[in-house]
Amino acid sequence: LKKHKTEFIPVDSEHFSIWYGLKNFKTINLEKVFLTASGGPFYKTTLNNFEKIKVSDALNHPNWKMGKKISIDSATMINKVYEVIEAKKVFNIGYQKIKILIHPKSYIHAILKFNNGLTNIIVHDTTMKVPIFNTLFLNSNRKLKTNKINTKILNNLDLNNVNVTRYPMVKLLNFLP
């Protein structure tokens, strides 16, 4: 990238949001990155009922329309483990600075907390159109038509810590250097 003076702009919503949130800041000033996860189709399922879960249940994501593999990865939260690893590699951020938060509505895609007291919260509709559009048409005056984020949505952002009993895949992050 440096050799060809090319800028890397991620397309995935969380990583695009980190990139966008860092545009006016340096990673050295970054205190914490919060990647959000919806919790998938089983967020409110009692642990006692996990034995009854079927593959078809896992494929029915409450917020996103995705393919089968990513739907399963989302339901088990292994996709967030991958995204933490990716964020570390792409942005050169230590694992200790990256945390996963549950945000069932999926409007917040990343939260960046800086050591100067500022926090960037990147919010957009639950569609990949937003990061893809902004990656392709960066710094243009084109407009994207999406559902508008409104005050009703912003009044209920609902963030929670990850329950590792419910999502044991997240424990894999404890084994990373």
List the predicted regions and their residue ranges.
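Catalytic, metal-anchored helix/loop core of enzyme active sites in primary metabolism
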Residues: 1-177
